[in-house]
């Protein structure tokens, strides 16, 4: 996101979109966890859409430097069904993807702008969008929502998708050690930050594989 400082309007649009996307993801995931039996999450204040409760500091750093961040992870309830596990892991990310597609559709219907077959996260890396202020806001926010939503579904701690991987995995010693190293010792965070800072092309390639087809579907591009 810092690369957009040369264009203050685009930077502010990206910043606002990222704050809203991360807050929405964390809030939705928290509400789903509470309804799945987590009685402690209400005590953390995460059942309110408060950015201070939902934006992960490392995720904010990833967003500032690499353009894509993540929200504070939600702990899994001790007693949970597979349905609850799947809902907690996927609902927030899928909600962001849905919002992103609706924003792209609104942009397409209002201005007949499409992605033109281009890689969608190129917009995120460039930090700019053409057209009027409203069109730029729709384009940048849609890409932020789509990218953040897809990133959250990847099975790497602290991302929500990892809850599904480790929640359904056998409780063998190997899996438990992997979970401990990636989550408790923050190697998962380190891997994400390294990709954001040193090899952003790899992270964007992963996101593009999912985001660009969705954008083309929404806009007919």
Where are these regions (language model features)?
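Hydrophobic transmembrane alpha-helices and their immediate loop junctions
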Residues: 1-221
């Amino acid at each position: 996101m810092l690369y957009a400082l040369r264009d203050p309007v685009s930077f502010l649009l990206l910043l606002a979109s990222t704050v809203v996307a991360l807050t929405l993801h964390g809030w939705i995931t928290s509400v789903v966890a509470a309804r799945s039996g987590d009685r402690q999450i209400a005590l953390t204040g995460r059942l309110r859409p408060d950015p201070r409760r939902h934006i992960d500091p490392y995720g904010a750093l990833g967003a500032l430097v690499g353009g894509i961040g993540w929200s504070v992870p939600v702990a899994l309830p001790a007693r949970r069904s597979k349905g609850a596990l799947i809902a907690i892991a996927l609902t927030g990310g899928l909600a962001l993807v849905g919002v992103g597609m609706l924003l792209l559709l609104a942009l397409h219907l209002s201005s007949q702008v499409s992605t033109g077959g281009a890689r969608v996260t190129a917009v995120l890396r460039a930090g700019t969008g053409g057209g009027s202020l409203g069109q730029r806001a729709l384009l940048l926010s849609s890409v932020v929502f789509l990218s953040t939503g897809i990133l959250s579904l990847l099975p790497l701690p602290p991302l929500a998708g990892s809850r599904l991987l480790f929640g359904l995995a056998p409780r063998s010693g190997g899996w438990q050690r992997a979970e401990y190293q990636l989550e408790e010792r923050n190697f998962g965070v380190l891997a994400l930050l390294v990709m954001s800072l040193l090899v952003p092309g790899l992270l964007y390639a992963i996101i593009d594989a999912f985001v660009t087809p969705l954008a083309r579907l929404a806009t007919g591009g």
